Amino acid sequence: MTSSVSRPSGRRADALRKVALTRHYTKHAEGSVLVEFGDTKVLCTASVSERVPDFLRDRGQGWLTAEYGMLPRATHTRSDREAARGKQTGRTQEIQRLIGRALRAVFDLEALGPRTIHIDCDVIQADGGTRTASITGAFVAAHDAVSKLIAAGKITRSPITDHVAAISVGVYEGAPVLDLDYAEDSQCDTDMNVVMTGAGGFVEVQGTAEGVPFSRAEMNALLDLAQGGIAELVQLQKDVLGA
């Protein structure tokens, strides 16, 4: 799809922003990635602990969980830290649960063994698509953490069953577009976040009409756009991992 819609960035309707995945961005975490979707920048780390939550004790399997947050000046105006307010927002809780679900969809938790991978996604700069960037970058960080577990002899095979990535799509000025930045996201008629595996399976679809209902044909067009964009992101993951 190459609609002639005029986007603020000048991109085609089916074009991603410039995407970069920088591995080993910090030195302490077992996996760390700086993911950039245009001007959106998120630091994703994967940390391994040799224990599992109480509800999984003695079950012989592992767990993967995620936390998400934004630096106070990640947006146009400063926001108080949620720790200072003493409570996470509903948006934060929703996004971190989404990140955890997305990655668990491509993990064999029994093969991981009785340990937990903690994913932390910290938004350094926000310009739309922070949750989709977080999922895409967190997968690479988790992959690096798993590689260290294998190298240390703690597991004998990778528990990762497939790649997973995510992208936003929406209806902007009446046309379906891929990978919305903030200027588009704040003005779009429909906003959708799509999470898919490398094999093309859907993990999650979150879609909302912003006042104007969308048709089945528009939804199908958005999903087609998302599928193409996610295929590009999965290929980028493979390229940076050397897979």
From Swiss-Prot:
Gene Ontology MF terms in the entry: 3'-5'-RNA exonuclease activity; tRNA binding; tRNA nucleotidyltransferase activity
NCBIfam families documented for this protein: RNasePH (TIGR01966)
Source taxon at top rank: Bacteria
Keyword hit for Chaperone: no
Listed GO biological process terms: rRNA catabolic process; rRNA processing; tRNA processing
Alphabetical list of Pfam families matching this protein: RNase_PH, RNase_PH_C
Gene3D superfamilies linked to this entry: GHMP Kinase, N-terminal domain
Annotated organism of origin: Burkholderia lata (strain ATCC 17760 / DSM 23089 / LMG 22485 / NCIMB 9086 / R18194 / 383)
Binding site residues for phosphate: 91, 129-131
The UniProt record lists the keyword Transferase: yes
Cross-referenced InterPro entries: ExoRNase_PH_dom1, ExoRNase_PH_dom2, ExoRNase_PH_dom2_sf, PNPase/RNase_PH_dom_sf, Ribosomal_Su5_D2-typ_SF, RNase_PH, RNase_PH_bac-type, RNase_PH_CS
Name of the coding gene: rph
Protein name: Ribonuclease PH
Enzyme superclass (EC): transferase
Function of the protein: Phosphorolytic 3'-5' exoribonuclease that plays an important role in tRNA 3'-end maturation. Removes nucleotide residues following the 3'-CCA terminus of tRNAs; can also add nucleotides to the ends of RNA molecules by using nucleoside diphosphates as substrates, but this may not be physiologically important. Probably plays a role in initiation of 16S rRNA degradation (leading to ribosome degradation) during starvation.
Entry EC no(s): 2.7.7.56
